Amino acid sequence: MSLVRKTSSGSNPKTSTHLIGSLARGLKAAVPTMDRRTFLRRSGIGVGAGLAVSQLNLLQKANAVETKAMLDGKAGKIEVKRTVCTHCSVGCAVDATVENGVWVRQDSVFDSPINLGSYCAKGAALREHGHGDYRLRSPMKLVDGKYQKISWDQALDEITAKMKALRTKSTPDSLFFIGSSKHNNEQAYLLRKWVSFFGTNNTDHQARICHSTTVAGVANTWGYGAMTNSYNDMMNSKAALYIGSNAAEAHPVSMLSMLHAKENGCKLMVVDPRYTRTAAKSDQYVRIRSGTDIPFLFGVLYHVFNNGWEDKKYINDRVYGMDEVRKDVMEKWTPANVEAACGVPEAEVYKVAETMAKNRPSTIVWCMGQTQHTIGNAMVRASCILQLALGNIGRSGGGANIFRGHDNVQGATDVGPNPDSLPGYYGLAAGSWKHYATVWGVDYEWIKGRYAPDMMEKSGTTVSRWIDAVLEKSDMVDQATNVKGLFYWGHAPNSQTRGLDMKKAMDKLELLVVVDPYPSATAAMAAMPPAAGGQVNKDRAVYLLPATTQFETKGSVTASNRSIQWREKVIDPLFESVPDHVIMQALADRLGFGKELSVNYKMLDSKYAGKSWREPEPESILGEINRSVWTIGYTGQTPERLKAHMRMMNVFDPKTLKSRGGKDPVSGYDTAGDYFGLPWPCYGTAAIKHPGSPNLYDTSKSVMEGGGNFRANFGV
């Protein structure tokens, strides 16, 4: 134990502000310069110490509980809770063993058709979230550069008083709310509703800086902004092109399906500037210059067209505009031009084209290696065009398999806090608002009255531009006013650029609220001294609110393949943490729209942090999602069906995801014909029993069997 403590220079690892101070010092040192070796050394020491301390504390907690149970003469209560890993979008199921309220063990679920009992290194460490010493333990307020513990009532009262003052003085658009892809579907949906009732569209989340280019690119190509097939369906692929994806590290369990496909003869090609662990498993590795994905893909198309490998019937029946693409490709993207742009010889490009064309169905996989470029949307469109030319979309083993990042980034995008749409990609036009006013059980004119004039149907600020919304002149931000108050709700700024500008923007705010299970880099940056020549707004107030992890609440989560799974609550909230949706309700109650927010929900009287809270039941929130999100088919995935799927995982085929039949012993629901997780679109009400759609745009099946065609326009 003494060795562990020495790594923190003798300071008490349980001091509330220890990590904040460490982050602040580290960030301060990092702003001018930090070489790679220093970064690795610091991060390695921190992680090692954290894991060691966490394990020791876990043993202490378990021993204490066991001793108390023995003294009381009571046998230990052991429960197994089924949850879903939070570390990526694959959706691996985990069974958590809880003894007397302490999470003591975790096991991968062998019955899960998605992960089949497998783990990656990240998933194997899942339990650390339930016992981390680095958790934010209580509400805190920044006072004279240091965080001080305060009560929940003080924090909520002061925050809402500041919000009301800003709303009155500078309109509701003076506040910006950054949501989270770590929220479950119910929390993400409730946050968008909550922000709407506050009276602004200034809300966003992580998808803006990861896969929003994918959503726009694929949605405007064939109708839905999502992965077309599934990880499991890749077992049916005869060839696979990974471009901008290092799945072996980022989505390790997804590689199981590809390795099974390779056993069946699938040819794996990896296109990446780096030789990655995924490339190490490839049949062909192609190194391109960073940012030249479009020339490369159009170079592949050149050989497809030049050799007559395109699917002419498919193009004639289902594709519009391919003649214009062919003309552009054949004139501009000759092998010589492609090699000049990408640095890839013609023979390598030809081999990729030949492999994709002669081994159909062939699939394409991309991640943020494409999407985070400044032209990410165009790169996504190029990938889509290649698959349309080859006739691979809407076919098992083909498709565009787009691996999302966070565990619920797909769900948060579908039903959560987007600045340019309401849940389900309903736009901001009056018709959309009237639809939701009806669903929410409130008057349309009441919602309209919550907004500043002309702002209700105007897109809000994005997470990538909130800095400008603070620092630029008001007439330059295309909003009613500058942003003066900011919520970081399950989001941290580490992955964004412009760190110095971000620090200046944070210093200029009048209100900064961080809602997170951990004291994130946001909290550290806020506590740092201002940059040279800068100053902190003397009226600024900074608060940290401890939220629970997803293992201390319950709700649904949408994997990258559009399958939805239900998480059980594993343990009660640690320390003084409170679930996100409960915090939303508490703020709404103080802001004057709590009744309107929860009018449709069953309300629970819950105990958190030693006090009573009004909690909207997550099942009730999902029921409202089922009644509202008709555009993309979130209507059939009721809590009852999802819970039955989680209990009956063993009846679903790991290759097709289809149930061979079996009744849930708890609810009596018969899973026969369902696809696991009821991947959207799952049309109609639960009574219709739509099975879900495993592969989008599959015309070999009827709509009621999970098939369907392209949509004429996104949102139709």
Regions found by a protein language model. Give the residues of each.
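N-terminal compositionally biased, intrinsically disordered segments and leader/signal-like regions
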Residues: S8, S16-H18, A161, I632, ...
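Detector for glycine-centered tight turns/loop "hinges" at secondary-structure junctions
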Residues: G101, G145, G397, N561-R562
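Polynucleotide-recognition surfaces of large bacterial nucleic-acid defense/processing enzymes
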Residues: K569, G633, A644-G661
